[in-house]
Every structure is written in structure tokens, then in C-alpha cells.
């Protein structure tokens, strides 16, 4: 009975666990795993195919080859289970134990484990405080290590060469000291190590040392020693005495035809180890000469090294086909390794794949499934149903019936498939909408039919795409597929909350065509009582589709949640719109569709419908729209021919004008008036403008036609040109493509992004000549190459994002924090990109929002901003709102739903258990792939925007400046001398409506608070050069200006003015060595007082003379700008990657470390010394390279975090000096800029979620009374929790600073070592985890997938919560039950003994 209980307990124990710990295995542990020692290198007998005894496949050690049969076949079948055959020694059991049972090899000499030796930082090196080189010399028998110096003058752990060793022997004798070679020496040192003493010494040393390098080293060692003490790992276990042998079925040996064998590389590597080990054992028995034994030990060490990690040290061991053998490390790492190939990616049963075709008659939740496929996929259900209905007596009969395809099978199939959802998946699955559930309709043929409206979500088209079908088997799986994954339940895009079920292409074309209006049509002016009457009239041929008519319509109002008809009115409309109104759901205003319906209108319609109606109505409406769109696009017969591409008459004239302008500039260049760079920029500018003009002329010509109305007058109306209608409706093509068809192709880009200055003046209708065709090939080729290369990049970015966000799940409803981020409207130049209402929609307020200019509360703290609130916010003109954010959430594991806000894909507050980290990663990664493929479609036509050289405002209002430093020049205009200035325009409500950046050197024509009118020019600048402005009046002195050596003096042929040009450093002669040309500004009266110095780059032009007196605001020098490059996402995707990897840009901006007054100290040879004196009088010094332009002057007061020297921002500095909120705003803004450029809409919250994960770690500056070490990097939440405990105990708190980690680094630094190991650098992660005895509590999604459990998200989240609760309850119950049972058993035993 007790044994039974024991077995029962063991079985339970195996099933349920909450964490996985990894550590170093002791020799005893390895022996305890083992079922026997492998002593021979033989594998199997090549004649009998039986395993050799005590060999690598021995059945006695690893278990039987066949189920329940010993090797000699004495015992067969189940009745002898667990019997050990006395003849061959094999246990009779399942043959699958050959996948589980391990063996071992007793090593004749200890061997160091290569992971702990070579995986950086070397654990052995750290622990023994020796360099890796020294340890290797000992290990590979090149030097002796003193393990016990005795009373000699030798030092512990001293290295001795052979010569030194023998000298020491002669001097001291061999009893006085001990020195050894090989792993044995290392093992001795490690086993003698007393970790507690070592830790105490290290603590003392770190307190006493002044050297930063030593402190770092001590802290590193202390961390390792502490973790060894805490984990119970012994250091000497890093040296192996016993080597475990992998179960044979994990390193199989398969006989091929012709007497050959296919074998796993591991068998070869094990054979080498066993051979060398046996040879060494024999040599030791024979007492062979030391040198031979040493050599054999070294070879054994190398053999074990290559078994564990081949190629890590020295040359790889090659197989017979000249490729390196795959070692144990190779088996687990990389894409083909155990983690990514078998644990995270598994093949799926009950699946099929086929080509997809369009199913225009399907409902949104349906797909067409070929009968042949369904028959195969639903086999088990069919067998069951055939048996239940009594059509087949056994499974065998059912199987025959299905194979012969008898008629009743098809009836059963219909019944089985009815309302049984299947999953459709299209690779690449970039976001969760790449797998959706549909109800199958059985169809003839072999292609899967897909509903056209879900193509957007799958990114599918019908040009040969394939899709896979999966069948959910269990009831629960079917239920989840139906409720969560059915296509009709996934109407919104999870990245932006916009509808994704939007009709496109032909459907849009049909709707657009039917809702266009035309004058002088049959039936014009008729009045219809309702839409059905209009439809009847149209179908009977009494009116045409585009005729202008009057229609009586009904308006609806919402009463008690239902739409009731309220008023009737007559509207002017067309027959087509009247027909379309028949499918409009009650409650949607007719005014929404009383226009030509383009793609945008349709998208808005679905959005409004989803927000005001129920989900079902929206889905039905989308379907109805699709059917109608297809019907009328077929009826319209829209197609196009070459005559539809109208070439504007004015084109030739425009091109001639442009050529003349280019010729003028060319002449100016040949006279030397302009530099080559300026000429190039101007030429590009002319052609860009001309291209735009031609395009505009073409659109005007193609977009309008003359029609004769009923009175015989001519009217210019929107054209019915096919090409125009396709582009205007948004069905096919764009104005950019039309421009190339019938305008001019314009400028082309070279593969490096620079623009070729000869444009293609022809279009595709005229045809290209040889030269133009050749220029075109550049862009076309770049498009294809880009697509191939960038898809991989984008996929890798998504993988890193998923990895960093995978363990972030909504775990509670509200964390109760008051923190949040301040949101403002997004304004770019003269247009509002996103209003404040849109930005805050679906977010929870972090504080009370007041009405403008009053104390009345408009939205209370903790309110979820709804659609109505969002509109109200815009109306009221509120400036900014503080909302809760994932970044500032206080939940321990995960995020609370209040900090996250709305679920983008559902439109209501997010539920507990949603995997927001993965959703965020998919939302950011999915468009990445699309963006990378963007270049390809426009065929490389250059998209250089015409150069902007001024700010012209669009609205009347008041101008305000931000961060503006300026000086007044002699014309009384302001000259800007700050680099991050902006001008904003506010309307009469005080709302900011426009915002522009102002470059350094710009001239401002309006004062702060000055009124401006629309179209006023308020700022202008030279777009082709960067000026250097004099900030004070004074005298100019040239330093190191030597004509012909450092500068050239040239004369402008037009103006006759002379100017200096720098000679590029690379081209200067030796005479220029040590000369650094610069301009000094000194006081006019006293040349000793230096006002400022300006270092000059090599491309500069100077229009001044030496000793010239100038006023403030004058231009000292001009630096020509870089040549125009096209803006393309190629720059965008790496930009996003750089932001998420938190990379420091080269020459990044320098920020002020503290608030205070600036002064300049004595400078060194290459650096300037900047001194900031704060209010307490403390001075902080900063050293800045001399070639950096410094934007501050002596005596200026500046704020912490201000920019001293311009450049790309460094996110680490922003976090350190300006805080988490500033960093969050910076990353969100920069990432959004890249995506917005491509017209992709992503919600800010997804980017915030990733930033939260990047901010997981902190650096401990002062450990206070905690157990942390100064300088240690640890989890933010752990520090917060420890601080709470310390505060309660009244102890000193930890002082820390937040760290920003790139997504790769953050993924590797996650608390879960399983997740990190499956991501990258597997061996390094596992080495670190095992030495520190890491415990993985299986919090994230990845770890749970790997150990084969439900993920703790969605329905799995509840499952794990329930499981934990049950576990706690069962422990208390089990203890009681066990106690009672034990009492009863004791009683029974006592009674039996008495009896």
C-alpha cells in the first residue's frame, strides 16, 4: 500500500511544476541519472544490427530495441514488464525509454567543461582570478600551477614553466610544495576554495580600493561567488570527472541500403572520447612515461571539448565529408537547434494547403473548402459519425467507405462540417489577423475560396497565393476559434483600431461608379418616394444610374438603444446613391453617402457603423457593400486604353522652360558663380518643380471634361475617364503612377539614393528612348534588391520585438498609479496630423481634466476617453491631457488594463490576460515588411520634395516661438542662432494649429505674439547652405589662413567679389601640417579680447576679409548642404531598429549635465573645457571636442538637459537628464515619424509597451541596507519591492538610476533564462544561468510554449490562475489525507502484528 502511495505521489510530482531551475551537475548527480557505464566505443554489430554490449547503444544500459522484448528474445510481451533478463541483462519495457535513459563515462582524468572556460566572461577565469590564457596553458599541459606552495617562496596559483618546475624541485624537493598540470590542478584549486571567506575578502577589498577598474573586477567576482553560495553549486563541478551520455534515440544510427549507416555526429564525438579515455586508463595502469600520459590527457580534454562545443577552441573536428561535426551545443542553438526548431516550432496535424481563389458570393464568416480536402481533414469526425449513424460497424469499415468515396460519406461530411470552424493561415503570418477562423462551405474543385474583404488582413491576393487550413479538434478549441478568431469578430486592425474589413479595388470602383453624378441624363429631375422606387425605375430603363433626382429619405434617432424612424425629408441625389442607400443600416445618415464614394468614404462608413451599430450590422453592411460593388463594377465595364492617358498640351512648353533655366545655371557654374553642389541642388529643384507642374496640368486635363446640360450650356465637371476614376476612387493606381503614365516620369534615383540630374521627360505612353530606359533600370533594380534584403531585416526586427514583449500580459484591472504621460496634438508644419482627441481616444485619464479657463471638471481622473469625449476635447480646444501609460504602470508582473486603455481590435477596455507585448510587437513589425516593399511599386521614381526655404502660414492667428535665441541684424530683422527653435501659430481660441521648425541662420519677420495672416511669409532662409552667424559685433581675424596651403582665394566673375575656400584636409600639402584655419572674433578696439572662435569645416566659403569690422547677425561663412537624397523607407526601417536598439548615433548631441551658468575653462589640444556653475556654487566640467559647434556663450544660464552641441539625440542622455517621460515622448515621436511618412497608422500605446520593456533594468548607485552590490544591474520592480520592505523596516533605501536597454539586450537580460536561451547566444545564456543556479518561474509566454503548457494569456491566463489556486488547496488537503492514511496504516499493521 505504501509503495502504491509512493508511486502515485511520484506520478503527480512529474506532471505539475511551477518553475524550472538549472544548475551545475555534481559527479554523483550524473551517476544517479545514468543506467550504466559506457565502456566501449562500438555502436552496433553491422551484421546482426544488434547493439554491442557496454557500447554506445547497449540495450542493457539504455533499454530494449523492441517494445516489451529483451535482446535475446527470452522474454516477450506485456506480461513480463519490468523483468530484467538474466541472460542479456535487458529490462523488458517500452522501447521509448531509449529516448530517456542516459549512460555515463567514468573519465580517467578530470576534464574542464569548455562552456565555463571559453564562454565570455570566462567563469573559471573570474572565479580563480586568472587570465583565460593562463588557465588554458595549465589545462592543455603547457605550464604547471602551484596548488599548494607549502613553506616555499612560491605563490598560490603561480604558473611555472617546465624548466621553472624542475628548478623548484631541485631547490625545495618534491615534498615541500605541490604543482600540477591539466584540469586536475584547476579542480584542486577550486575544491580548496572557501567561498564565504572569498566573498568576505572581496567585500573588504572593494571598500578599500580607490581604483575604478579594480572595483569593477571585485564586484564581478563578488557577484559570481555570491551566486555560487546562494545556488549551492560547488565550483569544482565545473570540472568533469564523469561525462553523461545522451540517450541513443536522440543520436540515432540508421542503416541505409548497401550496408552503410547514417549516424548522428554525436556518436563519432562520443567514440573519440571513449577511445581516448580507455587508452589513457590503460597507460595509467601501465605506469607509462609522464609525457605520454600528459599528451593523452590533453587529447582527452580536446575530445570532450569538441563533444560539448565543437570549434569553440582550436580547429573543428571534421567528419568524413569535410564538414565540422555537430556537437551538443550545435544541437540546441540556432534556427535548426532544439529550441527554435522543435520546441517553439512544431508541425501541425490535421492541416492541408492549397491555392486560393476569390469567393465573391461568400459571407464574411465563410470560406470555400474543396470537398476532397474536407474529406481528408475531417476523417476522425466522419468515422465517428458513420459509426454513430450505424452506416459502418467498425472503424475499418468506415475507413473503407471513405476511401471508396461512397455516396453516404458525402452526406455525413456535410453534417460534420456544418458549423465546425476551420482556421485559415497565410504565410508570412505577420500579425494575429494572419490566422482567422471561417465556417467551411463544401465546394467542387481543388482551390480554397477566400472572402475578398479579408484579403487586407491576410495581405493576400489571388495571383497564386497559397493558404493552409487547420482543423480545431476539441470542443474548447472550436469554441475559442468561433468566439475569438472568427473573421466576422475581427473587424478592426489591432495596430490602429481602424476597420480592416474595408472593401478595395473592384468593389470601390463599382460603388464609386454608381454614386457619381452626371448632368443631362435620362430621368433627370424625377422625384422618388423611396429607394426601392428608384431601383425599379432604373431596372425598367426609365432612368440612368447617374441621373440627378430627388429622393424622400428617413432619418433615425436612437431611442432606448434602438433606432426609430424620426423625420422624413427630401434630398437632391442620384439614382445610384438612392440604390446604395437601400443597404445603409438604420441610424447612418444619408448625408454620409451623398457624394461619390471613394475608398476613404467607405472606410469612414464602416468606422462610423462599427462605433454606432452592433458588430453584426457592420459585418452584414460590409458584405452587402461588397456584393453591390462587384455587381456595379461589372455593369460599368470600366477598362482603359492608351487614349485614356491624356498628355497635357502645356507639357512641351513647361519642359522647354525648365531646360532654359537649367542652361542658365550651367552657364553660371562654368563662370564659377555657383559651386558644383549648388548647381546640382538647383537643377534638381527645377526639375522637381517642373515634374509637379506637369503632373498638375495632367490631372487638371484628365480630371475634368466638358458636358452639355439640359439648357445646352457647356459645364466643366469631374471626368468619366477610366484611368482618372480608378485613381480618384482609390480603387487602383495613384496620382504618382498616373503621372508616370501620362505626365513625365521625372527624376530617377541611383541605387545609393542620390538623384540623377537628367530627368526622364517622357512618360510611358510616349515611350522611353535608350538613354531614358537605361536610367530607369537603376530604380527598378534597386526596388527588387531592396525587397529581397529588407524583408529579412523587417522579419528580424519583428522577431526581436516579439521576444522583448512576449512576457507582457494584462494581469490586473487597476494598479492605482497617478503617473502618466502628457499627450498633445501631433502637428507637422501647417497641418494637424492627429488631434488631441484622436491621440487620447481609448486612454484613461491620470488626473482631472478641467474645462479651459474654468475650474469645472470636464473629465474625472480614471475616465476612459470615449469617441464622444474625443470630439468634445477637440471642440473645447484643450491643450494637453495627462493619460495613464504602460510605461508608468505599477503592476509587478505585466500591466494593468487602466494603464493600457482600450483594446484596439475590440473598441472596449482591454481584458485581463491579453498578451499586449506580442500585439505591440506585431503591430510595429507587420507594417515594417510592407514598408520595405514600398520602393518597388513606383519603380524608383525619385521622391525628392522641392526644397523648402521659408515658412508661409496657412491660417490667421498669433505667432509664438519656442527655444528661440536670436539677435537683431542691421536691417532690424531677427536672425536665429539657436538650433532647436520652433514657431507655433495659435488660432483665436488659443489652440495650436501649426508648428514649424526654424533652422539656424533663418531670418524671422515677425515678433513674439505678433499677429499673422494666412499666406504670410514669417521666416525664410537659404536652403542650399548652412551659415555661420556672428553673434556679436567686432573685428574678424583669420588664423592659419595661408593662400595655396590651407585656403584658396577666388573671385566671383558676376559680382567681382573675392571669397576664400578651404582646401580639403586630404588635399593639403605637407606645409599645412599643424595649421588649423579658424576665424576669431575680437573686440573692435582691443584685439586681445577674444569674443568667440569658429572652427571651420573643409567645405566652407568665406566672403569676408581679414581684420574686417562686422555687426551682429552677419554671415561669417557658408557651408554648402549635402546633395539631395530621396526619402525612402530604406532609411526608415533601420531608423526604427536603431531607436528600439537604443543605439547612440555618431556625433550625437551633447546635453548639459546640470542647471547653471556657463563659463569656458582652459582648453586642451583637441578639446574645449566647459564649466557649469550651479546655484550652490559647485562647478561641473565637461570636455567637448573642438570641432563640435558649441551653441552657448560665456555667462549664459542654461537648464539641465539643454542642447550644447547639435546632432542626433542620444536616448540614454534623454533618460538620464530629462527622465522617463521625455524618453517615452522622444521614442514614440521618432518611430511615428517614420511610419507616418509611409501613411501607416499605429497607436502610440504599442510603442510605449516596447519602451516599457526597454526600461526594465536599473543600475544600483548605492545599495543602502539591501543585499545588492553597488553598480549591479537588476530588475526595476525588484528594487521597488526591496525599497518598500526597507522603508517599512526603517532602513536606508537603495539609490538607483533607470537604464535604457536595446531590445536585443533586454531580451537576453530577461528574468527567464529559457526565453533568453531560445532567442540568441544560447550557450552564453545557459552558462550564466547554470553557474548562478537561475530559477525560471515560467511567467512569460515563450517559456510555457517550450515546456509544453498552455500560455499564461487569454484563456490560458485563467487556467494558470485556477491551477495555482487548486495547488494551494490540494497541498493542505493532501497533508491532512496523508496523515489520516498513515495513522490508519499504522493501526492496521499493529493489529496484524497483535493478531
Curated annotation (Swiss-Prot):
Gene Ontology molecular function: any one: magnesium ion binding
Signal peptide: none
GO BP of this protein: DNA-templated transcription
Keywords noted in UniProt: DNA-directed RNA polymerase, Magnesium, Metal-binding, Nucleotidyltransferase, Transcription, Transferase, Zinc
Cofactor names: Mg(2+); Zn(2+)
Binding site for Zn(2+) 1: 70, 72, 85, 88
Name this protein carries in UniProt: DNA-directed RNA polymerase subunit beta'
Gene label: rpoC
